[in-house]
Amino acid sequence: MEMLEEHRCFEGWQQRWRHDSSTLNCPMTFSIFLPPPRDHTPPPVLYWLSGLTCNDENFTTKAGAQRVAAELGIVLVMPDTSPRGEKVANDDGYDLGQGAGFYLNATQPPWATHYRMYDYLRDELPALVQSQFNVSDRCAISGHSMGGHGALIMALKNPGKYTSVSAFAPIVNPCSVPWGIKAFSSYLGEDKNAWLEWDSCALMYASNAQDAIPTLIDQGDNDQFLADQLQPAVLAEAARQKAWPMTLRIQPGYDHSYYFIASFIEDHLRFHAQYLLK
């Protein structure tokens, strides 16, 4: 591992690291916020997954999460949104390829060689964080848009791994919206049954009651993508039918930007702290 940056921040440290990923077959970068030490108890971790076109720095520089994370004693880990590099397959569109990994394991050429973000987030990155930093094994997950989709599927596919999950303006039903259809067709092929494994609504309908974890979703009602790409009401209906403990908050006047995330990130951190710090 190589440290790229380090900054003092709210008595803790904001760092950026590069490492060689055996899962993704390329170098990867992640950011981490380490809160000031409180006692001898290792702090829990909140993983944050960003959206289309983003990297590990968007949340770090725009969300303003460090102050509350420092107060609560929560480590923040921000991975990149895809594998990257000259040898990594890409596309001219902003919504496919580098910066648009969709947090799944691709099965189709040319994507399958590198695009295994699901395995990276489930196994390699947490193991690296555990081995290199003083953290506990308690973790939660959150994200925005494509990253909200990522956070939800990570939680739904890995019962017991996370204490809680939250999302801002998530893509909840990718099998049925343009962003998801484009990405899944390329990464997973035309067999739509294979898509269901990566769709939060399908996963929630297939879930077991004992695996449900506290879930918080915020959605701005002035989000330009609300009607055609996001459709949180579809997941809310799945949660209602499954009696899944999910709160969906529609926030009047807010859009899809980091101004929206910055406005409510404190709520999300305090929500996760209830379960992470038990």
Swiss-Prot record:
It is an enzyme of class 3 (hydrolase). Keywords: Hydrolase, Serine esterase. Induction: Constitutively expressed. Inhibited by the sulfhydryl inhibitors (N-ethylmaleimide, iodoacetate, ZnCl(2) and CuCl(2)). Pfam families: Esterase. GO terms for cellular component: cytosol; protein-containing complex. GO terms for molecular function: carboxylic ester hydrolase activity; hydroxyacylglutathione hydrolase activity; identical protein binding; S-formylglutathione hydrolase activity. InterPro entries: AB_hydrolase_fold, Esterase-like, S-formylglutathione_hydrol. Gene3D superfamilies: alpha/beta hydrolase. GO terms for biological process: formaldehyde catabolic process; protein homotetramerization. Changing D218A: Reduces affinity for substrate and catalytic efficiency. Homotetramer. PANTHER family: S-FORMYLGLUTATHIONE HYDROLASE, S-FORMYLGLUTATHIONE HYDROLASE YEIG. This is S-formylglutathione hydrolase YeiG.
